[in-house]
Amino acid sequence: MKVRSSVKPICKDCKVIRRQRVVRVICKTPKHKQRQG
């Protein structure tokens, strides 16, 4: 899980979602998981 100020999809499988006002990227590649913080 990477914590960054700007989250962007890295590949075509990355999905940007909002969970309780936290922006997250979920992907089948574990390396691409991100959250905004």
Swiss-Prot record:
Pfam families associated with the record: Ribosomal_L36 (PF00444)
GO BP, one annotated term: translation
GO CC terms in record: cytoplasm; ribonucleoprotein complex; ribosome
SUPFAM superfamilies listed in its UniProt record: Ribosomal protein L36
Annotated GO MF terms: structural constituent of ribosome
Assigned protein family: Belongs to the bacterial ribosomal protein bL36 family.
Protein name as annotated: Large ribosomal subunit protein bL36
Natural source organism: Mycoplasmoides gallisepticum (strain R(low / passage 15 / clone 2)) (Mycoplasma gallisepticum)
Gene: rpmJ
